[in-house]
Design a protein with these regions (language model features):
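Structural helix-boundary/capping segments
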Residues: 139-147, 151, 264, 269, ...
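Surface-exposed, charged secondary-structure patches
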Residues: 53-54, 61, 65-108
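Short, low-complexity N-terminal intrinsically disordered segments enriched in polar/charged residues
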Residues: 1-48
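Short beta-strand edge/turn micro-motifs at domain boundaries
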Residues: 107-146
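Glycine-rich, small-residue loops and helix-cap segments
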Residues: 427-533
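Short, well-ordered alpha-helical
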Residues: 89, 133-198, 228-229, 458
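Short glycine/serine-rich loop/turn segments
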Residues: 173-310, 454-466
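Amidase signature
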Residues: 3-4, 143-169, 332-476
């Protein structure tokens, strides 16, 4: 099969300015490498070193290493042609190149690049040298605007469903996780085979109806990890929603679509669910506020379940006040006031990556917090894991069994483990859960437990499965305290750590409060953010 090649378009320069020798050939070679997804050639086209830049609508990548890592996880581009090429020399060995491209799929894209020749790289750094070739030092990519980004949305409208004409949430827009009933729309659960068999709902989930009654409108139905059985944020059928705060990073799941939509400004409220961290983890990865509510405080009627013992409704927002208003619109303003005392378990925090531990210690150093010990963290995790898996098999096992091959490999592996849990093991784990909850309630009381919302910053979308499994296990160890006790947990974007591609990446500070303190916990978080931020 012949390799696609970029053809030479008309080249435009200012009157009297000569075309820089070899530059257009370098531009066309780069475009040819893009069309062929020749990763090695693409890497070689960028100036090596920490100062090379590449930006697009998803964010900015700094350094040639970060750009190369991103490219390996992106895949190739579709066929397209160069329509126009503008060259503006800015010296003997530098030029700005602006390229208009016409994708075969329609629309127009605009590429702006700074090319340099004879790029001098600090020779003391291993692998760096001086090159006399033309290389890209800055690239900005503006692709055609898609009618809908299928990684984020299943369907959208302007609005999809209008809310009430007045209320505390008037003007707010909701990205609804694809687990909630919306009248006249089917639930897809992140799986096309499930969606194909689903009937349109004959009513709307009360958790969503409360937001509509307060004046918010539905922007669209947002993607979810399959059956909500993941905290990574990847979906093998629809793709991985982009993380605007960490380009090339996972958005976190399973409320991945709502998180991506809110973080990118496409909606102001994400309506999600949290079983093992499915609101807190995406909030942490994408720099959002996120609240997992008290278990059973918000109706789960007309909500596709994953694990009845732990499933809760939650919200994702870009600021604390919008989150407080969403919580109050659903739960009312009446709320138990948590004690102003803070609790920290250093052994629990030690589950997180070292960079997160250091950021947490620095953030909380000025707080008067009591040290506690929640007990054997591995035992708590195992109890949670078994009960969650047993519940998940009750909820979805019959369908999964009847549809072999319909579920992606990661989710299928978790359902396979769930299927192997015996009734005796499940009963034993449920008894242990009740005992753990009683003991932890006595330990935590009405105080607020502080811990990281996730064990790490957002991993790369190309991270190996063994690394994702490690991060998942560590993060669920942090998240399971709220799950086992049914307590609300708030994630606030107050920490940053080195990201997977260099630069800073967000990590949330988590506040676990007493049951029924949901609205007051958000208000406490707002005050704490003002104090620490």
């Amino acid at each position: 099969m012949s390799r696609p090649r970029a053809s030479r378009p008309p080249v435009h320069l200012p009157d009297g300015v000569a075309e820089p020798d070899g530059l257009v050939d370098a531009v066309l070679a780069y475009e040819t490498a893009l069309l062929a997804d020749d990763v090695e050639a693409l890497d070689a086209a960028f100036a090596p070193g920490p100062d090379t830049l590449r930006g697009d609508a998803s964010g900015l990548l700094v350094g040639s290493g970060a750009i190369a890592d991103f490219r390996r996880g992106r895949g190739g581009i579709g066929p397209r042609t160069i329509e126009r090429l503008e060259v503006r020399p800015i010296g003997e060995d530098a030029a700005v190149v602006v390229v208009t491209v016409a994708p075969a799929s329609g629309g127009r894209g605009l590429l702006t690049q700074v090319w340099r020749r004879g790029v001098l790289i600090r020779p003391a750094e291993p692998g760096y040298s001086t090159s006399n070739r033309w290389l890209i030092s800055v690239a900005q990519v503006a692709g055609p605007t898609p009618a809908i980004d299928g990684r984020v949305w299943r369907t959208v409208g302007s609005p999809l469903v209008a809310g009430a004409a007045s209320g505390a949430l008037l003007g707010q827009t909701i990205a609804v996780k694809d687990l909630f009933d919306i009248e006249s729309f089917a639930v897809g659960a992140g799986n096309p085979s499930w969606l194909a068999e689903a009937a349109p709902a004959d009513g709307t989930a009360p958790a969503l109806a409360a937001l509509l009654a307060a004046g918010a409108s539905i922007r669209g139905i947002a993607q979810t990890d399959e059956f909500a059985y993941s905290i990574a944020g990847a979906n093998p059928h629809y793709g991985t929603p982009p993380n605007p705060l960490v380009p090339g990073g996972l958005p976190g799941g399973s409320s991945s679509g709502p998180a991506s939509a809110v973080a990118s400004g496409q909606a102001s409220i994400g309506l999600g669910t949290d079983t093992a961290g499915s609101v807190r983890v995406p909030a942490s990865y994408t720099g959002l506020w996120g609240l997992r509510t008290t278990h059973d405080a918000v109706s789960r009627e007309r909500l596709l379940p994953l694990a009845d013992s732990f499933d809760t409704v939650g919200w994702l927002t870009r600021d604390g006040e919008t989150l407080r208003l969403a919580a109050a619109a659903t739960l009312g303003e009446g709320s138990i006031e948590p004690s102003p005392a803070y609790l920290i378990d250093s052994g629990l925090v030690a589950v997180a990556d070292p960079s997160v531990q250091h950021a947490f210690a620095a953030l909380t150093a000025g707080l008067a917090a009591e040290t506690i010990d929640v007990g054997d963290i591995d035992e708590l995790f195992e109890t949670f894991r078994v009960v969650q898996a047993a519940d998940a098999w009750i909820a979805d096992g019959t369908w999964v069994t009847a549809h072999p091959g319909a579920v992606g490999p990661g989710t299928a592996a978790r359902f396979k483990l769930a299927a192997a849990i015996t009734h005796e093991l499940a009963d034993s784990a449920r008894a242990a859960m009740r005992a753990h909850a009683a003991r932890l309630d006595g330990l935590l009381g009405d105080s607020v437990l502080l811990l990281p919302s996730a064990a790490s910053a957002a991993p790369s979308t190309t991270a190996p499965e063994v690394e994702l499994d490690r991060v998942r296990a560590a993060t669920i160890r942090l998240c399971c305290i709220a799950g086992l006790t049914g307590r609300p947990a708030l994630s606030i974007p107050l920490m940053t750590v080195p990201g997977p591609f260099g630069g800073d990446a967000p990590v949330g500070l988590c506040l676990v409060g007493p049951r029924g303190s949901d609205v007051a916990l958000v208000a406490l978080g707002q005050r704490l953010a003002g104090q620490l931020g």
